[in-house]
């Protein structure tokens, strides 16, 4: 039973498979038949269209003079131009005004383009007479070759037309080209700005010109630029290719180059545009000094991306004369009263050091290391040297866990202290003064050591805020190299000042 069932299923599968194969084959055959039928239908339609077109052409050839008359050439030309321009054939003047090269000036008279159709209407030409005889001779023939040749002849006679009619504003003579374009107005932005024809007319019109040539230099209206045009110096005897010089060329200085007055493309002689303004050109006035010219083209901006602003000693020397010593001492004393010891140092205070006898370079930058070296150079013994400030800051440590800022300040400012305090890398307030500057007198010369030094240098019109620098950056190199004490002054460590800073806050 199971075997018979399996046999039936196998037969059904084979039948289905055969049916699918036949369906696929039939679909392919149908597609091929459809393509062939479609191609045959297209060919039949094309043949029918060809026959109809041939019959229509033969009818037009046989009855052309009865339909169009004897002046078929002029009529066909007008209709072809109207079909191209999409205008009315009754008004021929619209073809002239629609031209892109025409001017809006009503004073400019239209050229001989409107008269050209009237010239063509004088009568049948010899070509048309020959066409008439050929037409009557070929109508008797019934072959397709004769009809095709007649169509070609008729097409050539119709298409052959005067270029001056299709472009009515292109005048044939050179006098008509030079005359209207030289007197033509530039109607872009100023109607009173005209172009002169020659050098004599330009000399007479200088008083009537509302604009100077420096603002709007005139452009020579020549129809074609010479190939070998190389102009180095403009002189009074130099002439343009048409024999006349415009106002810009007659009044230009001998040292100016050709690039000072750019000339537009001479491809269309009917249109003249304004050239660039003087501020966009590279022409420089020789009478003005160079510094006055660069004042308008240069922005004096000082953008410094470094951490430390470089200083110029010339600026500081001028400001140090006007800055009084009393004002400097008063500002430093006011800043030293702050508990955080944040020093705000402007450019005048920095540059006042140049008047003390230090030889500073033009790009000397302020830093903690340079400050220690500068002070140690001026007074070698007091305050302590740069090496002592770095190497012996950890000597003589004592437990000061219960100290406050006030008690440490009173301890540091005792008159029994012989040596000024050595800077610590993390202290809160240990002494007076600024790390970057020293007092002008030996009595008021002190030190200020803080966690950070906040330098704000005010320049002309702007102030740059520099990043915070810690004193510990300059002291981490040789901190543990030498710990031998050479003096008995007490210094504070960072862990000893935690309670002091917290109590103050």
Swiss-Prot record:
Low complexity bias: where? 250-262
Q: Compositional bias (Acidic residues) spans?
A: 203-212
The biased composition feature labelled Basic and acidic residues covers 283-292, 318-336
From start to end residue, where is composition biased (Polar residues)? 90-102
Q: Where is this region: Disordered?
A: 81-147, 160-212, 242-293, 311-339, 414-441
Q: What is this protein called?
A: T-cell activation GTPase-activating protein 1
């Amino acid at each position: 039973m199971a075997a018979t069932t399996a046999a039936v299923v196998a037969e059904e599968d084979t039948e289905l498979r055969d049916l699918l194969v036949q369906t696929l084959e039939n679909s392919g055959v149908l597609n091929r038949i459809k393509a062939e039928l479609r191609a045959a239908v297209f060919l039949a339609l094309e043949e029918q269209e060809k026959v109809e077109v041939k019959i229509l052409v033969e009818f037009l050839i046989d009855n052309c003079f009865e339909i169009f008359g004897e002046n078929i050439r002029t009529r066909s030309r007008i209709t072809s131009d109207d079909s191209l321009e999409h205008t009315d054939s009754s008004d021929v003047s619209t073809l002239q005004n629609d031209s892109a090269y025409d001017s809006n000036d009503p004073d400019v008279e239209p050229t001989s383009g409107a008269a050209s159709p009237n010239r063509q209407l004088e009568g049948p030409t010899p070509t048309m007479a020959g066409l008439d005889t050929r037409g009557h001779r070929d109508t008797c023939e019934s072959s397709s070759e004769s009809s095709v040749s007649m169509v070609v002849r008729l097409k050539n006679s119709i298409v052959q037309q005067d270029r001056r009619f299709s472009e009515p504003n292109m005048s044939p003579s050179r006098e008509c080209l030079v005359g209207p374009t030289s007197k033509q107005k530039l109607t872009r932005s100023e109607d009173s700005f005209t172009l002169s024809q020659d050098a004599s007319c330009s000399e007479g019109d200088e008083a009537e010109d509302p604009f100077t040539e420096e603002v709007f230099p005139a452009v020579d209206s020549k129809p074609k630029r010479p190939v070998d045009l190389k102009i180095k110096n403009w002189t009074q005897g130099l002439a343009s290719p048409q024999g006349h010089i415009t106002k810009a060329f007659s009044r230009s200085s001998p040292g100016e180059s050709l690039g000072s007055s750019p000339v537009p493309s001479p491809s269309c002689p009917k249109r003249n545009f304004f050239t660039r303004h003087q501020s966009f050109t590279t022409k420089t006035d020789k009478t003005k000094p160079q510094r006055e010219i660069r004042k308008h083209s240069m922005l004096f901006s000082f953008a410094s991306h470094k951490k430390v602003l470089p200083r110029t000693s010339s600026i500081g020397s001028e400001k140090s004369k006007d800055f009084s010593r009393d004002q400097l001492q008063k500002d430093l004393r006011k800043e030293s009263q702050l508990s955080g010891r944040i020093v705000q140092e402007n450019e005048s205070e920095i540059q006042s050091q140049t008047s003390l006898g230090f030889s500073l370079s033009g790009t000397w930058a302020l830093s903690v290391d340079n400050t220690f070296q500068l002070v140690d150079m001026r007074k070698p013994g007091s305050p302590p040297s740069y090496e002592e400030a770095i190497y012996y800051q950890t000597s003589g440590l004592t437990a000061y866990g219960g100290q406050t800022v006030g008690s440490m300040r009173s301890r540091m400012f005792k008159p029994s202290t012989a040596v000024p305090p050595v800077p610590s890398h993390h202290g809160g307030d240990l002494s007076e003064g600024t790390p970057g500057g020293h007092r002008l007198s030996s009595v008021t010369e002190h030190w200020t050591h803080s966690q950070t030094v906040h330098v704000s240098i005010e320049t002309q019109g702007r102030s740059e805020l520099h990043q915070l620098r810690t004193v510990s950056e300059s002291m981490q190199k040789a901190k543990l190299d030498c710990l031998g004490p050479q003096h008995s002054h007490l210094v504070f460590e960072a862990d000893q000042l935690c309670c002091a800073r917290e109590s103050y806050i």
